């Protein structure tokens, strides 16, 4: 037990993790770009045990297709005071076969802005992990462990 009498971190089952993935609408795609990590927020859906999102030509497409990626989703429930996160690691592939494209186009997955997102990416999971924990009460959460430092110039 943690100092506050609650379990510090609960490891979620795969089923619980997928349940949270189905509830969220925005996740973060983590990729390597020019030997540097980068993160892209994307709206997505869970479909057939995988993550599906739409994108356009560009860095996100070039840095994800055919590569191992990480995909993270998190949330906070103010009524219970619990936060959670789920991470999927797997290979991203572009959906190209006609029957898969037609199925994906039937999903209620639409771009959030006017730029066309004609490419459909599917992340096939190799690992799924999730955690849930109780957030500290406000005074403890806002107490700095050390004095803040100025940002580098």
For the regions a protein language model found, what residue spans apply to each?
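Extreme N-terminal tail/first-helix region
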Residues: 1-22, 142-153
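Short gly/pro-enriched beta-turn/loop segments at secondary-structure junctions
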Residues: 22-24, 37-39, 66, 116-118
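Short beta-strand segments
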Residues: 24-56
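Beta-strand residues in well-ordered beta-sheet regions across diverse protein folds
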Residues: 30-32, 54, 72, 124, ...
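Short, surface-exposed beta-strand-loop junctions and turns on beta-sheet-rich folds
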Residues: 35, 59-61, 137
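A generic structural motif
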Residues: 46-48, 96, 129
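Short, structured beta-strand-loop surface elements
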Residues: 57-120, 125-127
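Short, active-site-adjacent segments that bind or coordinate small-molecule cofactors and metal centers
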Residues: 108-153
């Amino acid at each position: 037990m943690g100092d506050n009498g609650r379990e510090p971190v609960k490891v979620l089952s795969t089923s619980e993790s997928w349940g949270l993935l189905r509830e969220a609408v925005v996740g973060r795609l983590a990729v390597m770009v020019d030997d540097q990590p980068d993160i892209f927020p994307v709206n997505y859906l869970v479909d057939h045990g995988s993550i599906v999102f739409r994108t356009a030509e560009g860095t996100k497409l070039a840095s994800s297709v055919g590569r191992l990626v990480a995909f993270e989703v998190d949330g906070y429930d103010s009524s219970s005071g619990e936060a959670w996160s789920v991470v999927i690691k797997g290979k991203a592939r572009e959906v190209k076969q006609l029957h898969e494209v037609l199925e994906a186009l039937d999903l209620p997955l639409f771009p959030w802005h006017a730029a066309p997102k004609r490419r459909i990416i599917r992340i096939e999971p190799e690992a799924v992990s999730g955690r849930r924990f109780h957030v500290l009460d406000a005074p403890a959460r806002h107490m700095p462990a050390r004095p803040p430092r100025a940002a580098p110039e």
